[in-house]
Swiss-Prot record:
It catalyses: uridine(2552) in 23S rRNA + S-adenosyl-L-methionine = 2'-O-methyluridine(2552) in 23S rRNA + S-adenosyl-L-homocysteine + H(+). Its EC number is 2.1.1.166. This is Ribosomal RNA large subunit methyltransferase E. The active site is at K160 (proton acceptor). It is found in: Cytoplasm. GO terms for molecular function: rRNA (uridine-2'-O-)-methyltransferase activity.
């Protein structure tokens, strides 16, 4: 085990939320983030129907089950196969939240439209701030799109976002579809983490507008060249710092070209 790995293991052992989650048989320390968010904003209530986007390893599914009780209903979706939880009213589906067939499958499972959609998913981290922020926004905007397809009117939405230049543009976009939007960082988030949570309440029923002039929506428009540049960046072990800087600059230029 390398020095970095040893340091990480030691830090984790000292982490009160990691130890508490282990004692309580929760699958992730992130479980306590949702507990704290709900304590502050009253997002999930007893008997609610909840959908968890990017639910692996299942910590938020467990938290949502504790909040909704036996009469609630929770469905999680993730690209990974999730080990089933011992509750009849918690179901995990392997699939892509952007895939219409997967969404149809979830809608068929649900007893009614969800009251709440939650998303604690993270993109693949490159270690380059600009790229990670962009990937986070792409992922969270896809989560917002999914929320507008599934949520019942008046429903709530919770999503994790990485801070960066366009963070408040994302909050503005969320505000187009919800009556209220808040930003917060729960106590269980690590101090050094760039993550922030957006809490959106009372969905107004509007469907996602792909023709929006929002800078955030522009990020979703496909551009093969941008993908190729980001793929090159993911292999940057063999790329010099100077070349990495040039790639980031190119990504910004390509992003600026989008209509």
């Amino acid at each position: 085990m390398g020095k970095k790995d040893k340091r990480w293991v030691l830090q984790r052992k000292k982490d009160p939320y990691y130890n508490l989650a282990k004692r309580k048989n929760y699958r992730s320390r992130a479980t306590y983030k949702l507990f704290q968010l709900n304590e502050k904003f009253n997002i999930i209530k007893e008997k609610n129907v909840v959908v968890d986007l990017g639910c692996a390893p299942g910590g938020w599914l467990q938290a949502a089950r504790d909040m909704t009780g036996e009469e609630g209903f929770i469905v999680g979706i993730d690209l990974q196969q999730i080990k089933p939880l011992p509750y009849e009213n918690v179901i995990a589906v392997k699939g892509d939240m952007t895939d219409e067939e997967t969404l149809k499958k979830i809608q068929d499972i649900l007893p009614e439209k969800p009251d709440v959609i939650i998303c604690d998913a993270s993109p693949n981290i490159s270690g380059v701030w600009d790229v990670d922020h962009t990937r986070s926004l792409e992922l969270t905007t896809m989560a917002l799109m999914t929320a507008t397809k599934m949520l019942k009117k008046g429903g709530n939405f919770v999503v994790k976002v990485f801070q960066g230049d366009l963070f408040y543009k994302y909050v503005e976009l969320v505000s187009e579809y919800f009556d209220k939007a808040f930003t917060t960082k729960p106590r269980a988030s690590r101090e050094e983490s760039a993550e922030v949570y957006v809490i959106a309440k009372h969905y107004n029923g509007k469907k996602f507008n792909m023709k929006s002039k929002s800078d955030i929506v522009k990020l979703l428009k496909p551009q093969d060249e941008l993908k190729r540049e980001e793929s090159a960046l993911s292999l940057r072990k063999n790329i010099s710092d100077e070349d990495t800087g040039m790639i980031i600059k190119k990504i910004k230029q390509l992003r600026a070209k989008k209509d």
